[in-house]
Amino acid sequence: MHNDKDLSTWQTFRRLWPTIAPFKAGLIVAGVALILNAASDTFMLSLLKPLLDDGFGKTDRSVLVWMPLVVIGLMILRGITSYVSSYCISWVSGKVVMTMRRRLFGHMMGMPVSFFDKQSTGTLLSRITYDSEQVASSSSGALITVVREGASIIGLFIMMFYYSWQLSIILIVLAPIVSIAIRVVSKRFRNISKNMQNTMGQVTTSAEQMLKGHKEVLIFGGQEVETKRFDKVSNRMRLQGMKMVSASSISDPIIQLIASLALAFVLYAASFPSVMDSLTAGTITVVFSSMIALMRPLKSLTNVNAQFQRGMAACQTLFTILDSEQEKDEGKRVIERATGDVEFRNVTFTYPGRDVPALRNINLKIPAGKTVALVGRSGSGKSTIASLITRFYDIDEGEILMDGHDLREYTLASLRNQVALVSQNVHLFNDTVANNIAYARTEQYSREQIEEAARMAYAMDFINKMDNGLDTVIGENGVLLSGGQRQRIAIARALLRDSPILILDEATSALDTESERAIQAALDELQKNRTSLVIAHRLSTIEKADEIVVVEDGVIVERGTHNDLLEHRGVYAQLHKMQFGQ
């Protein structure tokens, strides 16, 4: 099996073809139009022979009467075919790019969390936008040039051989030399194109970091650092572009030099008496004009090669992502609503790409309807435990059970439907407040249910003050809201979801003391009759938990109730003393 980076242009295009095939009707129409367009140019040149031999050579004035009409007709045909071909190719190109982007977008949504841990957002955005657009270049502008100029070359060759095969046969020597030159340049174009795509991802990442962290940049005076970083990747992109221009600029004169040598040799051969006797003024003019006309399509084909190779390199990059293994969803068990029993048995887990396990031999039972709190220092593994319940990652050893069945037995959709998550890193969408609360299920919930969830999360106070209430668009990631307001929207979302298992990962971390007190009552109500896993730094929020589990360096070191752990005077007692000074 070939690696994508080793695929030839032909193999890459063959793989792209199934994406293009549904729109081949547009390609056929465009191809016919392009061939007619090239034929009109070739036929225009062929008119030189009757014009010189008959119109002027024999003073046959009838040629000068009908020829202007033919020229006008050919120009009209040329204009129509040019429009039809451009429109059809652009239509096909747009469809192909949309299809590729949808496939890429859908495939990325099915990728495991570990995939996104390794990739920068800017690079992935570049794949969906820039690389997909490069595919358009290969399937639109490049294709137009290849078909039109290819048809022109074939037409000119046929016409030259028809009028003087002796002179035209010399050009056969030209074909393999030009082919070798194009192949060498193609390899160079593709290598540069791959580097340009990677660099474009770095440019996007640099810009994205500045835009998302512009407040931090301003506060910490990072303008110079960010400017230097962006200048560095931008200059790298410029250098790659210059390499592309250099390769293209060198290939043009090489191709033209080869063609010029062939033309010079033809001119020399035409001086031989045996050849000259068979030529008329019109014939030799048509042959020489055709040879000169060959320069343009040869140059265009050489130039379009750079564009085509960029598209093929982009295809390979996209295929690399599309070939990446998606999240494993091999479970068959579907459950409408779980009871909520969760159990970890001898679970060991290591993050992909790391050597040291994040969790070691975790044994933990969370009975249905009970609340278990995880505490510990930052990086101890608390959030990792929570992420394993939703199977964002698969464990190395042991098993995790829900209602007595291994999580891997459930379909991912069914499993995740049992869990509501409120984390410290709330993500909101550039949509209305109502649609954010009822995210992905706007048609399932009534307006009254959405309002009730917002009220229980103590969010209606600030929502009612907005211009359009629940219909207010809150900007990208809730940029128009405060941290506490964003957190309450997320809690309202969890309330509305009404899942049997609840994960609260620092759910009140962004709230002020007053808001925290107000919302704690709602969280207490939410946790009733639900299996709750609460992760908290503020120990005051988990004192009423049925069990508190202390995690240190990926290992459970203590467990018990709040009072039991204080009496034990272990790690939990130390953490409590640090927070409350007792």
From Swiss-Prot:
Result of altering C88S: Does not affect ATPase activity
InterPro entries with a match to the protein in the record: AAA+_ATPase, ABC1_TM_dom, ABC1_TM_sf, ABC_transporter-like_ATP-bd, ABC_transporter-like_CS, ABC_transpr_lipidA, P-loop_NTPase, Type_1_exporter
A GO CC term attached to the entry: ATP-binding cassette (ABC) transporter complex
Listed EC numbers: 7.5.2.6
Membrane topology: Multi-pass membrane protein
Effect of C315S: Does not affect ATPase activity
Keyword Transmembrane among record annotations: yes
UniProt-recorded name of the protein: ATP-dependent lipid A-core flippase
Species, as recorded: Escherichia coli (strain K12)
